[in-house]
């Protein structure tokens, strides 16, 4: 199966409600979609959102990187030579991790289709279902409590609560949600780099001293402040998870060796696709460090790839935060992964299993 061409498109899925963090507010999933075409008629699907505040990628940069630098290198290549093709993608240009992720996802989709098996089986197999948490966005306390109770009613057993704008208000938010949930769900906090190291320790100790048990706190300090992250990790009981601090396998090794965090959050848009995500999961497994599989505000195309990865690497990926499809007003994909609130199931279709994408607007060649 050889790659003969590619097309790009745009996909927009409005969110049910705005998604608010300490960093940004998002109102819709807006993905660049890549379709890799082959001589056998098979199509590989990949996608990536713009995440300028996190990775630096915009829709324009994603399109330019794929059109001008990445996709042309793949024309005429056999998808069976997956490792070499992924190396071509990664070395096509510096940074641009979202663009690389979109193309790599499409490559892995084609590779598994050529093998005639679902992607997770090609990656090593596993039980084709996982459970995700759901995010409670930063908002007024009453609204966040109502959102938490609504999530419980829809079957979610883990709530990821956005904090990080103001530590005193954060404490009140968590206390209110903790009281309302009353032990019916685990609580995960995500500060999105919003605290200083001392603020993080003070805030978390206040919550811990109040008897509030939290499953983890994610990226409490600035991404580049590894010393600060280690400072927090050493001084609180709640496990600390690194997100924006870990994009690459090398960063994962450094963070683990310095004991700067207890958990690593893997996101395909940070790692530049599946090849580096697999490396990070394997590194974490060697060190006995658990991982979360996470996502940006992105469509079910790329999240499906993350689900396949999580199933195949269940020895190290023990937590999932793949709620973006549940935040959208509709699921644009048909086939592959079935997103049913907290329960994510993979069918037995080859590759990602995507048959059609509703609402996709192809760009002119």
Predicted regions and their residues:
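Metal- or metallocofactor-binding catalytic centers and their adjacent structured scaffolds
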Residues: 5, 37-114
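Structured beta-strand/loop patches that form or line metal/cofactor-binding pockets in enzymes
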Residues: 1-40, 45-55, 327-330
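Flexible C-terminal active-site loop/helix
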Residues: 4-15, 29-31, 296-365
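Glycine-rich phosphate/pyrophosphate-binding beta-alpha loops
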Residues: 48-57, 135-139, 292-295
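N-terminal small/glycine-rich loop or linker at the start of catalytic domains
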Residues: 113-137
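Conserved, mostly hydrophobic/aromatic
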Residues: 3, 34, 41, 70, ...
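Catalytic core of soluble alpha/beta enzymes
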Residues: 161-164, 168-302, 330-332, 337-339
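Gly-rich Lys/Arg/Thr-decorated short loops/hinges at beta-loop-alpha junctions or inter-strand turns
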Residues: 127-132, 151-158
């Amino acid at each position: 199966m050889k790659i003969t061409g590619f097309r790009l498109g745009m996909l927009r899925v409005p969110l049910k409600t705005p998604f608010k963090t300490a960093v940004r507010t998002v109102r819709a999933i807006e993905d660049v979609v890549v379709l890799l075409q082959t001589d056998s008629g098979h199509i590989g699907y990949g996608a990536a959102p713009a995440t300028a505040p996190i990775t630096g990628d915009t829709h324009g940069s994603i399109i330019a990187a794929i059109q001008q630098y990445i996709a042309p290198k793949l024309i005429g290549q056999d998808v069976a030579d997956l490792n070499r093709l992924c190396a071509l993608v990664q070395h096509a240009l510096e940074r641009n991790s979202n663009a690389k992720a979109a193309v790599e996802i499409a490559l892995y989709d084609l590779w598994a289709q050529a093998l005639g098996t679902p992607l997770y089986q090609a990656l090593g197999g596993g039980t084709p279902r996982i459970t995700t948490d759901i995010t409670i966005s930063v908002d007024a306390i009453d609204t966040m409590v109502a959102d938490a109770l609504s999530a419980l009613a829809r079957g979610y057993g883990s709530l990821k609560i956005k904090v990080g704008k103001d530590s005193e208000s954060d404490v009140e938010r968590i206390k209110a949600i903790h009281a309302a949930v009353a032990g019916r769900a685990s609580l995960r906090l995500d500060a999105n780099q919003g605290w200083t190291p001392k603020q993080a320790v003070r805030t978390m100790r206040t919550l811990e001293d109040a008897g509030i048990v939290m499953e983890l706190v994610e990226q409490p300090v600035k991404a580049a402040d590894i010393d600060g992250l280690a400072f927090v990790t050493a001084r609180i009981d709640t496990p600390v998870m690194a997100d924006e601090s870990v994009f690459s396998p090398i960063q994962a090794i450094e963070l683990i060796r310095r004991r700067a965090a207890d958990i690593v959050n893997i996101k395909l848009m940070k790692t530049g696709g599946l090849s580096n995500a697999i490396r990070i999961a394997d590194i974490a497994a060697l060190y006995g460090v658990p991982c979360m599989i996470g996502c940006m505000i992105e469509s079910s195309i790329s999240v499906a790839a993350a689900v396949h990865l999580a199933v195949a690497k269940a020895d190290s990926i023990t937590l999932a935060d793949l709620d973006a499809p549940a935040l959208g007003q509709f699921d644009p994909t048909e086939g592959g992964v079935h997103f049913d609130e907290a329960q994510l199931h993979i069918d037995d279709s080859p590759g990602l299993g995507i048959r059609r994408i509703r609402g996709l607007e192809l760009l002119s060649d």
